[in-house]
């Protein structure tokens, strides 16, 4: 039986020999070494180096002769060489007792060093295993050698047993090497994944940098200061990448992962450490808050724009309001002028009616009342006409009382003055539906909400109290807008009412003017038809018929061409006569106007003279009053002086009398004067 048959083909299902290694335990040790927990202990190395370092009691007796197989036994020094080399190779391998702390940039170099150390160990074991595999192959090629079928214990010497152990260990090492190669492939795959993830993160960081630059360029600096206040303060002292933003709150979660994992990566765990859920939640909240800040800033800008629009709207409304007030003032003045014209026309009508009635033979009471009313009106409107109306002179004066024609002329002048004032006014036109006031702009809240719904981005935060306040402010703005519109409508209504009143006042005035013109025309036509013949008592009836013919037109005569020619000749004669009378009346009117102007000038001159005389009289009166007061004052002063002199003289006389009385008593003269007597 050969030595190959005596070697175990498999270690499954049996316990290993005392001097052998368990492949399952070795594979588990290799796995621990792969995960970074491999420890180079002297006991494991002693166990890996085989039974040559164990005691002699653990060795199996070998009965076969080594020299018959052509295999020389190895000396202990030769057997120890591969063990020492393997031990040196394992010591040269950078296996640490703890997890290797490597950074992300030198992962590939660390893996390369580990791989080179493993290759050195495998090469050392392979070199020594080849030296022991040659005697075994010679034994396999010579199965019929003497003593091959002898006793197994005698045929297997110590060298063959060592060779078998090393061959089996070589197989185990090859298995471990395959495992290490698979792990290396997985490590390379994970390294490639890490590199791909790094590239992805770099792209994301570049995109974040671009977006950050856009955000820094578009919003005001206050947003950046707010972002710095919201940024994570714990990472202020940490080392930052050159491409990472300094204080931006928009930092991507992958950046924090890279920062946190750059100093904690190890050989056994190459994937980056994921942040905690609290970090994710905080980052999401920061992103939401930043979006809300941006949306609120946009909302603020929109509100400012709407506020500017409303300011312009208010200014335009104030301008329109001033314009409406000016138009209302103009309408008030126009209404007042219309009322004055109506009053003047009523007085003129009363004068004309009274004059016509007086010509027919009526009483003069109506005429006097009309003249009195006209005088009162002229006195009342004297300031508006800028003309001083001559007042009726008292009895005994040389100024005559104004005639009805003069009063009518003055009233016509006042009407002309009112018309000139009317022409100076600027009456607003009637408002058409096209020029009606347009409704105000849409509310700011609806406008801003519409714009915000169109714009992309995070929605506004759900505000409760602030939203209610905004709604309240919007309601107040709407109420103020409605009140302003109501005021404008009321002013427009008042303007329309004033315009309607002015038109109503103009109607009767125009009717009165038309009646007056018709009356004048009828009067002129009546004077022309009468022809100055007053001896026929039926002249009044003929004048009435002429007036009726004037209103109704010339009668149509039946007949031929002669009737028509006679009618046309009659009408032409009447027209020429009426024109002549009109010219005469105009000349008379002009002469009357000139006389009126002369009388007015005389009246003004006399008024000026009387005013001058009054001023002179006042001056003389004041001078006389002053002289009287001065004389009275002087008289009083003289009286007071005389009274004082009399008092002094009485006192002096009393003193002299007392002295004389005393002297007389002292002398005892019987012929002394009496006390009532005085001596001068």
Swiss-Prot record:
Q: What family, per the record?
A: Belongs to the MCC family.
Its domain of life?
Answer: Eukaryota
Protein name according to UniProt: Harmonin-binding protein USHBP1
Where does the UniProt annotation place the signal sequence? none
Pfam families per the record? USHBP1_PDZ-bd
Q: Where is this region: Disordered?
A: 1-101, 135-162, 217-250, 524-562
> Known InterPro entries for this protein?
USBP1-like, USHBP1_PDZ-bd
| Coiled coil among keywords | yes
Q: Name one GO molecular function term.
A: PDZ domain binding
Q: What is the name of the gene encoding this protein?
A: Ushbp1
What keywords are assigned to this protein? Coiled coil
Instruction: Mark out the compositionally biased spans (Basic residues).
Output: 1-15
UniProt biased composition (Basic and acidic residues): 76-86
Can you tell me which residues the record assigns to a coiled coil?
A: 177-219, 362-386, 479-506, 573-661
- Please describe the quaternary structure of this protein: Interacts via its C-terminus with the first PDZ domain of USH1C.
